[in-house]
Amino acid sequence: MSGGGGEMEERLLNGSETEQRRESLYLRKKIWSEVRKMWRIALPSTLFRVMSFGCVVVAQAFIGHSSETGLAAYALLQSTFIRFIYGIMAGMSSATETLCGQAYGAEQYHMMGIYLQRSWIVDTFIATLFVPFIVLAGPILRLLGQNVVISETVDEIYPWVIPYLYSIVFTMTMQMYLQAQMKNAIIGILSTLALVLDIAATWWCVSVMGMGIHGALLGLNISSWSVAIAEFVYVFGGWCPHTWTGFSTAAFLDLIPMLKLSISSGFMLCLEYWYMSIIVLMSGYAKDANIAISAFSICQYIYSWEMNICFGLMGAACVRVANELGKGDADAVRFSIKVVLVVSAVIGVICSALCLAFGGQISYLFSDSQAVSDAVADLSIVLSISILFNIIQPILSGVAIGAGMQSMVALVNLASYYAIGVPLGVLLVYVFNFGIKGLWSGMLAGVGIQTLILCYVIYKTDWELEVKKTNERMKTWTLNLPAVQSTTISTRDEERK
């Protein structure tokens, strides 16, 4: 009997071990599947941002070799008006990401095309409101005391910025629309081809045609609109048969709720874009301003490249959360959040360690000055900590965007960045004389507080309740498929007629 009992015990133990191995294998497969889904979104999204940033850098490089005044005018226009407007438009496009992601998860595919058309209407309207600011950029800069010659050059080049502004409306919204339905490869391919076209077109316009700064901006417009046109062809040409059923009068319904969500989205993201610009502006008033600005700009450049990875991961977090909320699976939402946070934390630790390891050596890629190198090395610790925080914070923002919490994130950004980060930086620089390290420490404090608040909010979020809210939003905003089809102008239907 004792022998039989021992055998039974052994079989139970073996069965338990087998069950544990099965559960472990299932978990590994589940994690790997989630990681693959995440990178399918994050890689093309990152590539899009890197290539878009590259097109702006190409224009600046060609302008710099053509005219010092032109370079100063372009840099001033880029760092103030274009960056300001781009931040708002990029933020507003995240509303498209939220709605399309949730609609895709809920299998309300026909609504994705409607949401895309509504975003075109709303974003084009907002972009048009900014046109007078671009037209009056020169007088505004002169009013602010900027150099007259540079501001007059801005008067010459502003017309080239207006078509670029409208290209952003379409490229950003269509990117979010395609990204929400996992059609990511086309985004990366078009972005890469656009950069190649941008280099070729800018070289031709500047070096061959002798158009100078105007040629550089023409090249930028050619590349940006080529992406928009290619995306139009992809969407209209039948590659999105379930989500694009043609133009519809339903696009003009529920524009006010769409406008509210878009504005809160734009406000949320633009606060992050402006934060670094304000910090750089403040560095110009620090002791040894030339060294301070140079060192700060180098650190900002490193920080900006890392931000491209961050925003790619943010897009992945947003789409995955929105998709699973649309499906009504709260457990899958939690699992997606855990996976993307772990992956981003690993990337953050690696980038942070590289920054610490190479410290001042990084500066020699941009400057031969020993003083600048020492200043960058002095900032390397706070820069590495910033990178670590910065890789986590966008993920949390992406989760919030996927759930439609843009207004909450905007308030958190406003409080942590502008009520804490900027004032603390000013205090450390001008009262305690900590120099640019104090300025960056103030910025780091703002990012750190924002990260902690978002961590708490995401941790306390009732995802079952968010699923219910998503279902209610889908019911409120979703049109019945037959009704949509009756108001749809389909090119293929017209051809058959």
Swiss-Prot record:
GO cellular component term, pick one: membrane
GO BP terms: xenobiotic detoxification by transmembrane export across the plasma membrane
Gene Ontology MF annotations: antiporter activity; xenobiotic transmembrane transporter activity
Membrane-related topology note: Multi-pass membrane protein
Keyword Oxidoreductase among UniProt keywords: no
Keyword Amino-acid biosynthesis: no
Annotated compartments: Membrane
Primary subcellular site in the record, as a coarse category: membrane
Protein name: Protein DETOXIFICATION 25
Organism: Arabidopsis thaliana (Mouse-ear cress)
